């Protein structure tokens, strides 16, 4: 069933964190995460980055570019990785509309950049120069061009598209709208029914709480807590993960439950509300109108999604 390979390699359960070509959802997630970490509430700057309008002389932009090229696998181990760029191109060459000779030329140009010092400025300067000389090409190779992205989503329903939350996307795979167990999940965050094992595997990976190799990512869980202005529960999360007795066959569900029990339902659901709303559009935090956490707005939006799910 196609749904079971949601998010490409993520749900397929890749057994290492070695880089592999990324689908448009993965790219969009990493792009937005880097923007959140570096835009410093400069919403005008974030708008420029979304359009790949990258200024060579701007310090924030330089460190954003470093974050982005590392997250997308273009730069690793103190060097640009032309083979990774070529692999990304090959994975979607029937969709990206880029000539292979052009892709190879750009990959090779990036490979020549001397950025061994790992500094933001060294990485960004060369990258921006190559990108500016080949406007729009890397956006197509990395599936950020809207026409390329939309075509891939249309052909690959196993990939979560923009506009649907991670919990609705996973819920539709394993439950029927209005189903009692599903409504229990939506209202309380957990269910003992067998379907929840698969559902939590989907959501936990989609939230990036679980890595491709099956390990839990403590930093991703804490990121969600901090996003809802809860900064005093880091140790609770750490202890919940350390003390969790998870079984291989239900690993995601078991860790999910350990975190749930550690934080308590109220706080856990507060975090999930935010993640659900943000997951519909990864640029949610980058818009001034929705940049500040508003618990009431989150709850109102999630209630609307509950109604959509007939819960």
Swiss-Prot record:
What the entry lists under Pfam families is as follows: PBP_GOBP
GO biological-process terms attached to the record:
sensory perception of smell
Q: Where is the signal peptide?
A: 1-16
Query: GO CC annotations?
Result: extracellular space
Q: Where in the cell is it found?
A: Secreted
Q: What is its main location?
A: secreted
Record: residues binding ADP: 146, 149, 153, 160, 281-283
S-S bonds: 34-67, 63-120, 170-202, 183-311, 244-258
Additional record remark: The amount of D7L1 in the salivary glands of 5-day-old Culex quinquefasciatus is approximately 31 ng. During the blood meal, mosquito injects approximately 7 ng of D7L1 into the host.
> What's the family?
Belongs to the PBP/GOBP family.
* Role according to the record: Modulates blood feeding of female mosquitoes on vertebrate species by binding and sequestering different mediators involved in the host response. Binds adenine, adenosine, AMP, ADP and ATP, with the highest affinity to ATP and ADP. Inhibits agonist-induced platelet aggregation and hemostasis.
Q: What protein is this chain from? A: Long form salivary protein D7L1
Q: Which organism is it from?
A: Culex quinquefasciatus
